[in-house]
Amino acid sequence: MNNRVHQGHLARKRFGQNFLNDQFVIDSIVSAINPQKGQAMVEIGPGLAALTEPVGERLDQLTVIELDRDLAARLQTHPFLGPKLTIYQQDAMTMNFGELAEKMGQPLRVFGNLPYNISTPLMFHLFSYTDAIADMHFMLQKEVVNRLVAGPNSKAYGRLSVMAQYYCQVIPVLEVPPSAFTPPPKVDSAVVRLVPHSTMPYPVKEIRVLSRITTEAFNQRRKTIRNSLGNLFSVEVLTELGIDPAMRAENISVAQYCLMANWLSDNLPTKES
C-alpha cells in the first residue's frame, strides 16, 4: 500500500502534508493546548482531523483554516464535527488574524500541525498579529523549534530566535518521532507553545527597523557586526550602546538588538531608511 495514503487521502508533497496518527502524541498535544468552551480556538491545517476531533469534542465552535480543497470538503461533512466548524478554505499566509479575532470577539488561541515547507514564513506572518493572539501551539520540525528557543552564542540562534522571543515567550512542549506520522517525515518533530508578551520586555519603536537589523546581521553571520552592520552603525555608536563591535550576529542578545533598533529609529533621518 502507498504509505502516502492515510484514511483514503493521498498526502500531497506540495502542501507539505504528513498526517499525525499516534494517539499518545495526539492526547499529549491536546492536553498541552487545554481547549475550553467559549475560547476562540483556531486550527491551521487540520488535515485529517487528528487534532481537530479531540479538540472539537471539548468545544461548541472551532474555526479551521485548510488550503487543501479535498480536506476542507471532508471536514464540512464530518459526522459530528461538521456543525461546530467554521471552515476557511484558504492559505493561512493570506489570513488576517486581526480581523478574525475582532469577528470572534476575543484574542485567538491558534494551534496546528504546520506544513514544514511554510512553517517559518507562517510564523513571521502570525507574529504580526500577536496583539490579536492569546497563545499558539504548533507541531514543527524539531530544528525549527530549536531555533525558536535558542539563545545567543549557539549555532541555532538566528533571526527567527530574535523575532520570536521579541514577540513571545517560547516554551518547548514535547518531541515527536517520525513514526507518529503517515507518511513518516525524514526529520524529528516537536511541539512548541508561544505566548505573546502582555508587556514587551524590550519594546522597539519600529519593528521594521529591528527586522532590518536582524536580517542584515544574520545574512552575514560569520562577519563581525563592525562589518555586517557597518552601513548602519559606527564603531563609536556600537561602543556607546555597550555592544562590542567584534561580536558576530549570534553573540548579540534580543535586548541588545532592540537597543540597536531604537537607536537607529532615532537616527534614521541622517541615514537612508
From Swiss-Prot:
Record family assignment: Belongs to the class I-like SAM-binding methyltransferase superfamily. rRNA adenine N(6)-methyltransferase family. RsmA subfamily.
Single GO term (MF): RNA binding
Keyword terms, alphabetized: Cytoplasm, Methyltransferase, RNA-binding, rRNA processing, S-adenosyl-L-methionine, Transferase
Primary localization: cytoplasm
Function text: Specifically dimethylates two adjacent adenosines (A1518 and A1519) in the loop of a conserved hairpin near the 3'-end of 16S rRNA in the 30S particle. May play a critical role in biogenesis of 30S subunits.
Binding-site residues for S-adenosyl-L-methionine, renumbered to this chain: N18, L20, G45, E66, D91, N113
Reactions it catalyzes: adenosine(1518)/adenosine(1519) in 16S rRNA + 4 S-adenosyl-L-methionine = N(6)-dimethyladenosine(1518)/N(6)-dimethyladenosine(1519) in 16S rRNA + 4 S-adenosyl-L-homocysteine + 4 H(+)
PANTHER family, alphabetized: DIMETHYLADENOSINE TRANSFERASE, DIMETHYLADENOSINE TRANSFERASE-RELATED
PROSITE patterns the record matches: RRNA_A_DIMETH, SAM_RNA_A_N6_MT
Organism (species): Klebsiella pneumoniae subsp. pneumoniae (strain ATCC 700721 / MGH 78578)
Compartments in which it is found: Cytoplasm
Gene that encodes the chain: rsmA
Entries under HAMAP family matching the protein: 16SrRNA_methyltr_A (MF_00607)
Family annotation (InterPro entries): KsgA/Erm, rRNA_Ade_diMease-like_C, rRNA_Ade_Mease_Trfase_CS, rRNA_Ade_methylase_Trfase_N, rRNA_adenine_dimethylase, SAM-dependent_MTases_sf
Enzyme class: transferase
Gene Ontology cellular-component annotations: cytosol
The protein, known as: Ribosomal RNA small subunit methyltransferase A
EC number(s) reported in the record: 2.1.1.182
